């Protein structure tokens, strides 16, 4: 009887210790999960909200929209001001947006599946404010455009190829002071004067101070049949533009 009581006590102690280990392990796992996500969230965004942001020149500056569809899907029509980094490329192009880890990042695709996968990749790589927007097949966006958008570094690289016409949509005085190589001066109100200076079969690059004035020019050129790429980063934002006199 004495030995049996000793065995029962040992069993109780073992069970108690095992329960404590399980509970402690669960708490640690929960805490670890919180640490991995406490500074980063993925929030669903309604299409109407994104449309509102894209049509507000002040609000749109607070967001970067990334269309993670393939290039041909993006070129067929995309949300205004969205850049294109496909889901298949996003891991290899993290450096292109590494300076924006604290900015509001909106990802979008056709149905929401690829954009959610992209958001998870961004989350794992330190991006903190992520929004997964309704896909273009789920919501009828009013802000769709065929004007492509790139960031300042890529814009400079495109200019350097010499394969594009370039339009500077800043004030004429600022253009006269310095501008991107080969650029001509113009704005949305002088499109009629610009057209004779732009070969029809040659794609056009547009830029300004912040991307707004140049986008207005870009949309009018796109409506006139040109392939247009606009710089989201203007000369006030991307200080590495190679400006010449």
Model regions and ranges:
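Hydrophobic membrane-insertion alpha-helices, especially the h-region
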Residues: 19-22
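Rhodanese-like catalytic fold shared by cysteine-dependent sulfurtransferases
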Residues: 2-12, 16, 26-55, 59-63, ...
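Phosphate-rich cofactor/ligand-interacting catalytic cores and adjacent structured alpha/beta frameworks
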Residues: 67
């Amino acid at each position: 009887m004495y030995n049996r009581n000793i065995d029962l006590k040992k069993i109780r102690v073992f069970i108690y210790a095992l329960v404590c280990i399980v509970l402690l392990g669960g708490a640690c796992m929960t805490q670890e999960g919180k640490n991995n996500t406490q500074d980063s969230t993925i929030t669903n965004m309604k299409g109407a909200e994104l449309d509102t942001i894209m049509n507000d020149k002040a609000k749109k500056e607070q967001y970067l929209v990334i269309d993670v569809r393939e290039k041909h899907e993006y070129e067929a029509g995309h949300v205004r001001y969205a850049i294109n980094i496909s889901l298949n490329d996003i891991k290899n192009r993290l450096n292109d947006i590494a300076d924006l880890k604290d900015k509001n990042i909106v990802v979008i695709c056709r149905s929401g599946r690829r954009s959610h996968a992209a958001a998870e990749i961004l989350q794992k790589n330190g991006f903190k404010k992520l929004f997964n927007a309704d896909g273009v097949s789920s919501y009828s966006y009013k802000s769709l455009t065929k004007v492509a958008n790139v960031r300042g570094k890529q814009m400079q690289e495109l200019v350097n190829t010499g394969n594009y016409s370039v339009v500077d949509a800043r004030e004429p005085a600022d253009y006269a002071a310095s501008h991107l190589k080969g650029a001509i001066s113009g704005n949305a109100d002088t499109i009629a004067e610009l057209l004779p200076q732009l070969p029809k079969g040659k794609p056009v690059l547009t830029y300004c101070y912040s991307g707004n004035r140049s986008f207005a020019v870009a949309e009018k050129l796109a409506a006139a049949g040109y392939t247009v790429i606009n710089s989201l980063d203007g000369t006030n934002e991307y200080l590495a533009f190679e400006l010449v006199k």
